């Protein structure tokens, strides 16, 4: 049973106005891949926002995998640890333009994962950004956060 009526709310721990992806357009559980649509806005048009587009797409993938595994609680938060490589082939995202962001899980264990991510222009498929993201999602988020305060 979903925890809300919005498909993004079911798989992302983010809430408006911090949800930057518009919708999930493709999900392939066997390939460990998810594609999301993003419409660039004035507030989120700098090229470095590509990493957040990618991180939210990877989080949506992790959330979809959780749901397939029978998890019914709220979407679990994780942390972007960094990237080994970030290639940006544009200075700014074109405001109002549609982009497709694909995240594919390259590695995953109980709490860490690595995602190969690509951002393309929807109109012509041109690659405008790509990166390998590393993420950490603790099994016990409350315990982890409590330990950080000690």
Regions found by a protein language model. Name each.
Residues 41-61:
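A short mixed-secondary-structure module that forms the rim of ligand-binding clefts
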Residues 60, 94-100, 104-150:
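HotDog/MaoC-like acyl-thioester-processing domains
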Residues 61-100:
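Hydrophobic beta-strand-centered segment that forms part of the acyl-chain substrate-binding groove
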Residues 23-28, 85, 90, 105-107, ...:
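A residue-level detector for short acidic-glycine micro-motifs
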Residues 19-22, 81, 101-103, 131:
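Small-residue-enriched segments and motifs
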Residues 3-15, 74-75:
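Short aromatic-glycine motifs in intrinsically disordered, low-complexity regions
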Residues 13-48:
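Catalytic strand-loop segment that frames the active site of acyl-thioester-processing enzymes
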